[in-house]
Regions:
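C-terminal lobe/lid and adjacent interdomain/linker elements of RecA-like ASCE P-loop ATPase modules
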Residues: 2-7, 320-413
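N-terminal pre-Walker A segment at the start of P-loop NTPase domains
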Residues: 2-24
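Phosphate-binding P-loop
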Residues: 26-32, 294-297
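Phosphate-binding glycine-rich loops of NTP-binding sites
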Residues: 32-70, 120, 286-287, 335-338
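Conserved P-loop NTP-binding catalytic core
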Residues: 47-113
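Conserved catalytic network of the ASCE P-loop NTPase/AAA+ motor domain
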Residues: 79-82, 95, 293-297, 324-328, ...
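Electropositive, glycine-dotted interaction segments
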Residues: 94-239
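Conserved ABC ATPase signature
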Residues: 239-294, 301-317
Length: 413
């Protein structure tokens, strides 16, 4: 099924994290449209995933709420670390636009979290020097207005009403700060999925909804929306589902007399459909993933955590390929343990995570690790190498604290 085409979305090209739980000092560079995080249990994959969730929640619900629900500094700051928690994103708004760097440092006082530093920086032209067009500390700072801020432009001093307020979130609501507004839209538009089969069985209030929720508990609402607004797309999604669940005949969302919405699935041999609560976990998970990946108005960034759960191993190669297709319009961040999912991936798309002897996460691209490019060049698949121990980590039957072994010829291509 061909993916719909969209304008070039914003892309994160690099991410640096300091002092966030096990991520004491981790950098991801030259990120691809699809980035897959691989590693043993407890290596930090879900923590990287949560960094995106933390930033998105901080923008959409407020820093304090995101901070408090994760246990504040006591639980968030890396054990034995000092100083603020820091995040730094390097991204482009469109494919050929200048790189913009967004830096956020969060500290804590007895009254709660404070934004210790927050700035935006870019460089105009190939020979220009980087300069900050937004620079705030503890609620006070300067910003340059306009669509193309320049180092010579006038800086306007601003003061926010709280030291925990994010300047990008506040100023990004004003039309006179289009670059700041673009970042705010980008981050608040991220979609981080923690899909579970149980949640997809929910019986929600009737009413069409455009996008799948984090847990998938509005799957019936999205099916209703697609049926009403994108009937051809829904037909294609269900055709895909039938290829994986051959006896599946149709999927419906029917409104009950009390205003709730029932998700119904019908097997071909039978006359009557069954309620979603009686459908298999794998069928519901596959339907939810297809609905998310073929969203008619896709998010700029989508996260999927361990999509292999409840799915037959032979379905994972195709699912990985569909994720890559979807990455043409949504940057994808995926965590996995599955060798079957890995077999469809390129070594440049996969980052291997491991905890060192101090307990902190280290991360290298698969293409940076000793021996991996050579084995791939000889025809091996990443999943095979993962299962046979060529990454040096990840075997739960023989755990150790050996560090990952990067190549000596520098970083990945």
């Amino acid at each position: 099924m061909p993916m719909p085409t969209f304008a070039s979305p914003p892309r994160i090209e690099a991410l640096k994290i300091r002092n966030y739980r096990a991520l004491r000092d981790v950098s991801f560079t030259n990120l691809r449209p699809m980035t897959v995080l691989l590693g043993p249990n407890g290596s930090g994959k879900s923590t990287v995933f949560d960094v995106f969730a933390f930033l998105s929640e901080s923008f959409s619900s407020g820093l304090r709420k995101a901070w408090d629900r994760r246990g504040r500094f006591k639980e968030l700051r890396s054990r034995g670390a000092e100083g603020p928690i820091e995040f730094e994103l390097r991204y482009r708004e469109r494919r050929n636009d200048p790189i913009i760097t967004y830096h956020l440092s969060v500290d804590e006082t007895p009254r709660g979290p404070v934004v210790a530093a927050e700035w935006l920086q870019w460089r105009r032209g190939a020979s220009g020097k980087p300069f900050r067009f937004l620079d705030f500390r503890e609620g006070r700072g300067e910003v340059i207005t306009g669509d193309a801020p320049d180092a010579q432009d006038r800086r306007v001093k601003e003061e926010l009403d709280s030291q925990e307020a994010l300047a990008v979130n506040a100023l990004g609501q004003l039309a006179k700060h289009p670059r700041v507004a673009a970042l705010r839209r980008f981050i608040t538009g991220w979609s981080l999925s923690y899909l579970t089969a149980d949640h997809t069985r929910a019986v929600p209030e009737a009413g069409p909804q455009e996008h799948l929720s984090q847990t998938g508990d509005n799957l019936a609402n999205v099916i209703q929306f697609l049926r009403e607004q994108h009937e051809d797309l829904l037909k294609e999604i269900l055709d895909k589902l039938r290829q994986r669940v051959p006896r599946m005949d149709r999927v419906d969302a029917d409104v009950m007399g009390d205003g709730r919405l029932l998700l119904l699935l019908k097997d071909a041999p039978f006359d009557k459909p069954i309620l979603a609560k009686w459908a298999s976990d794998g069928t519901l998970k596959m339907l939810a993933y297809l609905v998310a990946l073929y969203d008619p108005a896709p998010p700029a960034l989508m996260g999927l955590e361990e999509p292999e759960n409840h799915l037959h191993p032979k379905l994972l190669y195709e699912l990985a390929e569909e994720c890559r297709e979807a990455s043409a319009h949504s940057q994808l961040i995926v965590t996995t343990h599955s060798p079957f999912f890995l077999n469809a991936l390129r070594q440049e798309e996969v980052w291997v995570l491991n905890r060192d002897a101090r307990g902190y996460t280290e991360a290298f691209r698969a293409a940076e690790l000793m021996g991996i490019p050579e084995h791939m060049g000889a025809g091996a698949k990443l999943g095979q190498l993962w299962m046979e121990g060529f990454f040096g980590v990840g075997d739960p039957t023989s755990p150790d604290l050996r560090p990952l072994k990067p190549r000596k010829d520098g970083h990945a291509r």
